């Protein structure tokens, strides 16, 4: 016999104070059944009122228990409500148990169960339930088709997606939502031709349909086709929405189409579409990857609610564009507004610390990541590389050894770090250890080792590594990256013929490849070869970069081609909009100093917008020694030691200048001053075998 139960007003179960008589509930339900009323719409039913008061999983389970205990679970409407609530709270297994207890679920209950899985992003279960639904012979329904197609899209399940398409063909009619879902499924599964066919079959195309097709092109790296389709969309007088413009900006990012990206940015502003966080991040990414860091910062500054993703995008942008100090400054500001960084932020900042060898800040960021628990493989690998770049091999090795699972990225981080800081033998030893631990290297590993061999000047080791790379197929699969490192190795080891042979075998040469070969000719004193290859590069419509101009200017300087050097230096900032770096100014100073045009060289040093470094001063003082212009040398010495009073390398330059003029006493005084200040010269070494 059913008993009356008083429900406690305990907060834990989420109920208000209420007494419910289940005898009354049963009588009401029986009355409704006798009247022929549908319990799907029995909003006033006590059972439904009870379930509607459930505000958490505990209260729902208690109510479920009460209904089961009183024999009220045979009704399909109550089961449907329970399934819906379990799905809403994220307990799909409980929902499925209720569903399976109904011997003959109606179509509405099937749809509710399907919606539960969709709501909780259980796409595999959506596809399984859809198959089961079709086997039961239920009628076709647009909502069911849409949810099943969405699940196939998320799973990249092309086979089941095609099955649904075949079932759709048998349906007399269905709405555009289903067709757009089908289009989206094909596009995201890489079947762009099938997606385009579906697109052409849609007669009334709305903005969602157009955007899905454009997004399909962009996702499959057919960005130009996506932009053409957008023009067709405009011709059809369909206005884009936030997602349309987000997709178009992504296309411009992939194409490095800065001008087009700016145009879409302008369209966004004119359209009055509110810039969401997602759109702002897309704009930041576009400007950053197109090298327009100033516009990226402008977008960042203009947005009132800057979230973690935007901060991170801006910091990563500065780091990748070489503006490391700005990246680190922004990171400090981010800490000031109490936004907790994530692993991507930390890894990017550590990368920046390594690039400018800021060990102090790198250690501070390391401590912060431990303190607030921001740690993953990317952070560990960035730490290894940062310590290696800062010549802290022991710390780099310690972090590396502490990683429980060393993947290929971890090995590459320490090998490339050691290669770049001059610890060549350690890098080669780690490579041998990597092989002994059965870790398969990749193109990045081999490229780092070629750089190590180039620094070591070891033609024999590098040639063996070349043979190893051919055996493993790296020159075929990673031809540009590995091939460029290989030709650079041969060029630096004095074998330009082998370098040119490798250069000619690389089918898709990038700017770095051309620059490496141009630099290789320059290192051998073949300025004509460098300049001819540079002109060939321009004819191939390859845009030079800063490294290309460094190689060209260096080649002109070593062969006394002053007029040509001046022409290329001027072209660099006038024709290509590059801001000269310290390296470019050093090349110009070296070229003029070698040619005896020391007054012009001094004028460059004094007017440089950035601080000259030891190489720049060294190039000038070397010219002073060559042409016995010690009067000009004295001017630079004063400027140099005022700027760098505690750097031994500058004192060595001064001592060498005095020695070249036979002023041995003054050279000795400089050496004694170094000892008094505790400064010592770093020992040099030969890099040729």
UniProtKB/Swiss-Prot annotation:
Places the protein is found: Mitochondrion
Q: Its domain of life?
A: Eukaryota
Molecular function (Gene Ontology), one example: RNA binding
Alphabetically ordered keywords of this record: Mitochondrion, Repeat, Transit peptide
Q: What is its main location?
A: mitochondrion
**Classification via Pfam families:** E_motif, PPR, PPR_2
UniProt-listed GO biological process terms: response to abscisic acid; response to oxidative stress; response to salt stress; RNA modification
> Among its keywords, does the record have Repeat?
yes
PPR repeat segments: 75-105, 106-140, 141-171, 175-205, 206-240, 241-275, 276-306, 307-341, 342-372, 376-406, 407-441, 442-476, 479-509, 510-544, 545-580, 581-611
Q: Which family does it belong to?
A: Belongs to the PPR family. PCMP-E subfamily.
Protein's name according to its UniProt entry: Pentatricopeptide repeat-containing protein At2g03380, mitochondrial
